Structure formats: C-alpha cells, structure tokens
Design a protein with these regions (language model features):
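Zinc-dependent deaminase
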Residues: 1-12, 77-180
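Short loop/turn motifs at secondary-structure junctions and domain boundaries
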Residues: 13-17
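Short beta-strand scaffold segments in enzyme catalytic cores
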Residues: 20-30
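Cofactor-binding loop segments of dinucleotide-utilizing enzymes, especially the Rossmann-like FAD-
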Residues: 28, 71, 99
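A short acidic/small-residue loop/turn micro-motif
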Residues: 38-42
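Catalytic-loop motifs flanking and including active-site residues across diverse enzymes
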Residues: 46-47, 82
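Mobile, glycine- and charge-enriched loop segments
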Residues: 48-76
Length: 180
C-alpha cells in the first residue's frame, strides 16, 4: 500500500475533479509487477494505469494482488468501470485504502469484485489515505465526513473529530458537553 500511496502523490493536482489515486500490483511471490496513478480527466484511472504498466513490463496480473488507495470505480463515465476491468484481468485479491464516497460507487466497486470471486480487504492504511484524499473529499463530497461521523457511536465520533482536527479527545468531549 505504501507504493500506491506514493503513486497517488504523483497525481495530486493533475486529475481534474477525479481523486488522485495510486495503485500497485504485486505477484503472489511479492514482486512488484506494475504501478500507476490516476491520469487526467477521461484518461486511465490508477488501477488501469498499473495494469498497463505491468503488461508493458511483460507481466500478467492473473492471480496478483492489487493495492489501490481508493475503492475501484463501479460505473462507466468518461472511462470504463475499473472494478469490472480488474475482475476481468484475473486479479485474485484487491486491497483498498478507503471506500469511494462518490454516491455511485460507495461499496459498489467492492460488491462487483466480490461477486466476481475477487478477495477484497478494506481499510488498509485508511487514516493515511483519508488524510491524503481529504482535500478531494471536502471539495467533491463536502458532506460525506459529516454523514459518516453522525452515524458513529459517541466514542468513535470523538476519536474521529480529534484526529481530523489534531486535538486531544478530551477537548472534543468538552466542546460536545458544552454544546448540550
């Protein structure tokens, strides 16, 4: 996932209204087969760029593990759905940093992958990925953090707000108590 996170940084500022996503594809033996990041609007998303990189290096991704900082997209927009493409290429396992908050994705990419028999792990390095994509989430999906926080039990909500604002949980608890 660290390679994918580094790849995502290469895309920051060049993806239009798309998120800056990074991807790495690794063989069952742990060899890096390909890496990529989201290109400009209408161009390859990170997962496809990484698969093309693997192919250009002479590797197949059948049976490989794909690491992506964000859940692969599930709908055909300017580009085909990445989740379907990943499954069709024979990737065995997908490791995701965080779910895509886009209303047309949010878990749908994961569902497509699982229905195709791909093993999916979510939440790997999620705090780091959330911080990395924070600007995009706020810009493109401004209410997503609020909706997610409201759904959490009080202790988890306090921990989340403390992390987001970089303050001690006791300060958040005091603010919430003062507001009541």
């Amino acid at each position: 996932m660290r390679v994918a996170i580094a790849e995502a940084e290469l895309a920051r500022g060049s993806t239009g209204n798309n998120p800056w996503v990074g991807c790495a594809i690794v063989s069952p033996q742990g060899e890096l087969l390909g890496r990529g990041h989201t290109l400009g609007p209408g161009e390859d998303h990170a997962e496809i760029a990484a698969a093309r990189d693997a192919s250009a290096r002479g590797f197949t991704v059948v049976g490989a593990t794909l690491y992506s900082t964000l859940e692969p997209c599930s709908f055909h927009g300017r580009t085909p759905a990445c989740a379907s493409s990943i499954a069709a290429r024979g990737v065995a396992r997908v490791v995701i940093g965080m779910r895509d908050p886009h209303p047309r994705v949010d878990g749908e990419g994961i569902r497509i992958l699982r229905e195709a028999g791909v093993l999916v792990h979510e939440g790997v390095c999620e705090p780091e990925v959330r911080r990395q994509l924070g600007g995009w989430v706020i810009e493109q999906h401004p209410y997503e953090p609020i909706h997610r926080a409201q759904a959490l039990p009080q202790p988890q909500r306090v921990a989340l707000l403390a992390e987001l604002y970089g303050v001690a949980p006791s300060r958040i608890e005091a603010l919430l108590a003062h507001r009541s």
